[in-house]
Amino acid sequence: NTGIAFFDHMLQQISTHALVDLEIKCDGDLKVDMHHTVEDVGLALGDSINKALGDKKGITRFANSYVTFDETLTRTAMDLCNRPYFIWNVKTTLDKVGDMDQELFSEFFKSLITEARMNCHIETLYGDNNHHIIESCFKSFALSLKKAITIDPRKKNIPSSKGCLLYTSPSPRDHQP
């Protein structure tokens, strides 16, 4: 429950399609705007994913998925590598999707991906309906996450030829000016 109905609907897509339980309660400054609420939920969810995966021993690590939603086709590719990098190649034709500014969706994913310390590329190949475009992004992300976090019983160690997944730069939240 974030206080933003369309955003709650999108978060439900992550829970449903990644097969992860999400319980989110955010009491943000919605009287000002939705930006901080959406960004903070992304930061908190990304941090929770990173902590839940620990050293990532045994996970599949790499994943991709394509999702169709009527006329829309979206793909997501991710690597749970501890090196945050985000590409958002998604175009909508309206300033708002649901009750949200369209730019908030990339802000959400950027925050989540930074704190989860993953590399993630989300791209809509085509589509006309703005609701379908955004929802297919959330579903495609969720399916990729489900695959990437799946434990592979053949992998006994950390999924890296180096034997570790290190990232030594601090999170942008940890930066002190």
Task: Please annotate each region the language model reported.
Residues 150, 173-174:
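Short, cationic motifs built from Arg/Lys/His that form the positively charged side of catalytic pockets
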Residues 177:
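Cationic, low-complexity basic patches in intrinsically disordered or flexible, solvent-exposed regions
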